[in-house]
Every structure is written in structure tokens, then in C-alpha cells.
Amino acid sequence: MEQQRIEVVGKLGSTYGIRGWLRIYSSTEYAESIFDYQPWFLKIKGQWQPAELESWKHHNHELIAKLKNVDDRDAAQALTNVEIGVDLSVFPKLEEGDYYWHDLIGCQVVNLQGYTMGTVSEMMETGSNDVLVVRANVKDAFGKQERLIPFLYEKVVKRVDLTTKTIEVDWDAGF
């Protein structure tokens, strides 16, 4: 499996009990959704390796999981802090105007006046809407290092072109 086709969806946490269970830290929109995306791949020593989910459950306010062939605390402890990835092909297709964060990260952001504001370095979730975190160009004319631009499709974000990796926004470069 090619590494560039894998998207990180979470991380294995500390062990739970003595039978190989691990805490799961999900970075999916709904925490339990991490279990819908199968098969999992674990990044061990820089390489993605397949892993089979045997079982999962809620425990208090946490998610815990049991992986096949991880049968004791020592085996589980060796996987603590390992990233969980899935092949991008398992993600459902989205409707027009909806985008996965991993598709937006790395896009150039240009305002309506044609000024290149920088590159999307990450996404942030707020209570009301997602926010583009845009790392400004080194010699930004406005002295900015970073811009936070709300991802409000049609209001602020006018166009997203994933083939050219550009996002056009109605946003003042001075902000």
C-alpha cells in the first residue's frame, strides 16, 4: 500500500487492562466513526502495517479497542502512541461544496484581488464553523505569519479547485 494513500484518523493510547486492550484517540468528526473505516493501518517504525480490529467499546468516557493478535499488556504497550491510518478510498464521496480536511491542507489561498495569502497548514474546528489556518508566504506584504480564515462556503470561500490546489476567498489580506 502506498503511504500517500493513507490518512491518519487517530492514535492508539495507553493500555487498558492485561488482555491487550488499548485506549483510542479518534480525530474523526464523531469519535466512534473511527471504527467504521476499515481496515486500519498502524504506522510502526515509519511503515504502515495492516491491523485487524477485533472488538471495541465505550469505557467510562473513553473508547477502547482490542486488535487481533494483541493479547497481553506487553504487546499492547508496544503500540502506545502509534498512529492509526486508513486508505483514502474508504472515505465516502462528499456532496458539492463539502471537503475533507486532508484535501484542503496544502492548498494555496488567493483572495479576490489576486493576492496569494499563503498555504493551508491545518484546519481548526470551532463551535460555529471550520477555520482555515493559512501559513503566510515568507515575504508577506502585510507582515503576517499566519491567517485564520473561516471556511464559510459561498460567503468567504468562493471557490475550491482541488486539481490546482487553490482556494479563492473573499478576505482582506490585511486581516
Swiss-Prot record:
Record-annotated PRC barrel domain positions: 96-175
Highest taxon, organism lineage: Bacteria
Pfam families registered for this protein in UniProt: PRC_RimM, RimM
Keywords (A to Z) from UniProt: Chaperone, Cytoplasm, Ribosome biogenesis, rRNA processing
Keyword Phosphoprotein belongs to the record: no
Chief localization: cytoplasm
Entries under InterPro entries matching the protein: PRC_barrel-like_sf, PRC_RimM, RimM, RimM_N, RimM_N_sf, Transl_B-barrel_sf
Keyword Cytoplasm carried by entry: yes
GO BP term, pick one: ribosomal small subunit biogenesis
Subcellular location: Cytoplasm
Cited NCBIfam families: 16S_RimM
HAMAP family given in the database record: Ribosome_mat_RimM
Domain-level remarks: The PRC barrel domain binds ribosomal protein uS19.
Role description: An accessory protein needed during the final step in the assembly of 30S ribosomal subunit, possibly for assembly of the head region. Essential for efficient processing of 16S rRNA. May be needed both before and after RbfA during the maturation of 16S rRNA. It has affinity for free ribosomal 30S subunits but not for 70S ribosomes.
Homology family: Belongs to the RimM family.
PANTHER family attached to this UniProt entry: RIBOSOME MATURATION FACTOR RIMM
Quaternary structure annotation from Swiss-Prot or TrEMBL: Binds ribosomal protein uS19.
Protein name: Ribosome maturation factor RimM
Source organism of the structure: Actinobacillus succinogenes (strain ATCC 55618 / DSM 22257 / CCUG 43843 / 130Z)
